[in-house]
Regions:
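Bacterial N-terminal signal peptides
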Residues: 7-20
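Acidic, proline/glycine-rich low-complexity intrinsically disordered segments
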Residues: 45, 52-53, 75, 79-81, ...
Length: 680
């Protein structure tokens, strides 16, 4: 999560958002996710990344390079769930719908869940956990949501042999608007959603009614709560913006946390029985002996699962606080790590930490892509991990063995009293970085000689010793910054070409550590994500984008890129600027090659195409996966800052994206779900 500004006259303000077993049970063969007992049907999209492993690849090929120019809008749905206002009240539609059970399922920033007809976009049912305002028909949020801005998706489970009762229940509930006061009797197909209030909801996928057996042991009707269990640390619970994951008969749900509080609540990951809601296991990235000294390490991003090997893959974040770790100078090997858990017990099978003693907010930002790649002439079951640093790590899925070497590289030390930076960081070898990682004085950018000179003067005043330069009292340049490099949803695999398509941002931030005058400094409210009191530490942090007086980034463009990495050779096959800056009706010409800061990510299809929105210019693009050539684009009402998806009904392929803008980026805001298809 981050806020920055990028603008002035032609480039106005911009901000980018980037989030011990207690019991066990054997996997029930009768109750598994649809993809656990068979491959995902070609026309379905059953998890955030299409399949449980999160490949972000569709095997559909009806739309291809020859006909993509003919794509047209098939339908548009508007939920009404948006607030066109600045942060913190403005919304950001980041959802990726599922297509399964003959419906499209998605969530909104106001916590509602919709089921749509995939051919027409008409509503089948709506679940609203809030009471509804009588005048507007919209959720009446009282009290207002703590973070009413993001919901990236929902999860799906079904019994292996659902009964014929579905047809009757679905027919009776067509067009129904469910609330958390209803109850569904059957629930042999379930939609799971993380709520804003520590809850995990279970809904009947046919009707939208809550599954009354889920959470019944705790006295709930259709939901469970993390608050019902032991939680270490201080402060409020964080919200969860990403969907749960389903593996066998458990649903795995995580929480975010307050990383500006030294002993924040720990970011627990819990697995619940899909039917009863009973706790199966829980996982805490913080070692037990340190649970009351540090907190916040969590999994705010998406989770992937390996059905074949019964593994859950977690991308964990930094512990609290961001930017200063003087109070947590002890070993925590499961933070800033890819962690593979046994799906039945929740015990760690293997882990690999990729950031040591994080002082940079280098959270792991996206689910590991669990895909079969070609490397060294053989097919390998891989777990691919993109990072904010612009590094791509690859591991053998069942053992954690690196697929390309990782070496410990010496990095700059901290000069902040009380701090001690890690002496080395693990750097992969043999795989090209997908983002810019170095910055020199001569590279600094400016629209005019005057603002370029201003960037150079600022550069001379600040500390910059290359990558992993820690924050300092003097002020340090962090590049890549916590904006990325990579970020959530940012990578998609194409099995036909063995290419990983991955987007990046190339922006730097300035971070200054300031000693607190007294305890009252802890009570100063945060200005934004980069300027905060760091409660419980002797310092506060002030941060901003590294930019000129004109509000233009000092880092050289392109500020947003899309790259194809050849996983066999480790080299970039192609790289292009992604999108254009657009603000106040002005779009920077494509030929400038500046690219655009971006939120969201790509998908690939068997038609040889990469589809991506994500950019400030409100365009939805189709790129030739093998060459990087743009083949088609369509203008969206507002930016599509989400991961798109593709599905098929009756032999017809659709490509869909959520276009809702992003309040943290300062774009226009909306509530559009737009499907495209070839004309009949």
């Amino acid at each position: 999560m981050f806020i920055f500004r990028l603008a002035s006259t032609a480039l106005a303000g911009l901000a980018v958002f980037c989030g011990a077993a207690v019991g066990s049970a054997a996997d029930s063969a009768a109750d598994r996710p649809a993809s656990a007992t068979s491959a995902v049907a070609a026309g379905e999209w059953v998890a955030f990344g299409r399949d449980p492993g999160g490949s972000q690849h569709s095997p559909l090929a009806q739309i291809d390079a020859r006909n993509v120019s003919k794509l047209r809008r098939a339908w548009v749905h508007r939920s009404g769930d948006y607030v066109d206002a600045p942060q913190p009240r403005g919304t950001s539609l980041q959802t990726t719908p599922l297509h399964v059970n003959g419906m499209l399922y998605f969530c909104t920033p106001m916590n509602r869940v919709f089921a749509l007809d995939p051919v027409t976009g008409r509503e089948r049912w709506v679940f609203d956990p809030h009471r509804t305002d009588a005048k507007s028909g919209r959720p009446a949020l009282s009290p207002p949501l703590a973070n009413p801005t993001r919901c990236r998706g929902v999860a799906y489970w079904q019994s292996k042999a659902p009964s014929a009762a579905r047809a009757a229940s679905a027919s009776a509930a067509a067009g129904a608007r469910a609330t958390d006061n209803g109850a569904a009797a059957v629930c042999q197909r379930r939609i799971f959603k993380n709520g804003d209030n520590t809850r995990v909801y279970a809904l009947d996928a046919d009707t939208g009614l809550p599954c009354s057996d889920f959470g019944a042991a705790k006295g709930h009707k259709g939901w469970v709560s993390h608050a019902d269990y032991e939680n270490h640390g201080d402060g409020n619970f964080g919200t969860s913006t990403s969907p749960p994951a389903v593996l066998g008969d458990v649903v795995i749900a995580a929480m975010s946390a307050n990383d500006g509080l030294a002993n924040a609540k720990n970011g627990m990951v819990r697995a619940f029985d899909v039917r009863s809601g009973e706790l199966r296991w829980e996982f805490d990235p913080i070692p037990p002996q340190y649970r009351d000294q540090s907190g916040a390490a969590n999994v705010w991003s998406t989770i992937s699962v390996d059905v074949e090997h019964n593994l859950v893959f977690l991308p964990t974040t930094s512990p609290s606080t961001d930017y200063y770790g003087g109070g947590r100078r002890f070993e925590m090997p499961l933070v800033n790590a890819i962690v593979a858990l046994d799906g039945t017990s929740g015990k760690v099978v293997w882990s690999q930490q990729v950031v040591r003693h994080d002082l940079f907010d280098y959270d792991l930002v996206g689910h590991p892509l669990l895909v079969d790649i070609v490397r060294d002439g053989r097919k390998v079951q891989a777990a691919l991990l993109q990072t904010k640093m612009g590094w791509l790590y690859g591991f053998e899925r069942t053992t954690g063995k690196p697929l390309w070497p990782i070496v410990e590289r010496p990095v700059p030390m901290s000069d902040v009293p009380g701090e001690q930076a890690a002496p080395t960081q693990p750097v992969p070898q043999g795989m090209a970085p997908f983002a810019h990682q170095t910055l020199t004085r001569d590279q600094l950018f400016g629209i005019t000689p005057i603002d370029r000179l201003a960037c150079r003067r600022k550069f001379d005043e600040l500390r910059y010793d290359g990558m992993y330069t820690p924050p300092s009292v003097r002020g340090s340049i962090l590049f890549p910054s916590a904006l990325g490099g990579g970020n959530w949803g940012g990578a998609a695999y194409d099995p036909a070409s063995n290419l990983l398509i991955i987007k990046a941002e190339n922006l730097a931030t300035v971070l200054k550590v300031i000693p607190k005058a007294d305890a009252a400094d802890d009570k100063v409210p945060p200005k934004d994500y980069l300027t905060r009191p760091l409660v419980g530490t002797p310092y506060r942090i002030e941060g901003e984008l590294f930019q000129s007086p004109l509000g233009v980034p000092c880092t050289p463009p392109p500020w947003g890129t899309l790259m194809a990495l050849d996983l066999a050779t480790g080299k970039a096959r192609w790289e292009i600027p992604l999108g254009q800056i657009k603000r106040a009706g002005i779009t920077v010409p494509k030929g400038a090659g500046w690219g655009s800061p971006n939120v969201g990510g790509p998908i690939t299809t068997a038609g040889g195409l990469t589809f991506i929105g994500a950019t400030m210019d409100s365009r939805f693009r189709a790129i030739d996966t093998r060459t990087g050539k743009e083949l088609w684009s369509a203008e969206l009402p507002v930016p599509g800052m989400a991961v798109p998806m593709s599905y098929a009904v009756n032999g017809k392929q659709y490509v869909l994206i959520a276009a809702g803008g992003n309040a943290m980026v300062g774009t226009p805001i909306g509530d559009y779900l737009i499907a495209y298809a070839l004309p009949d």
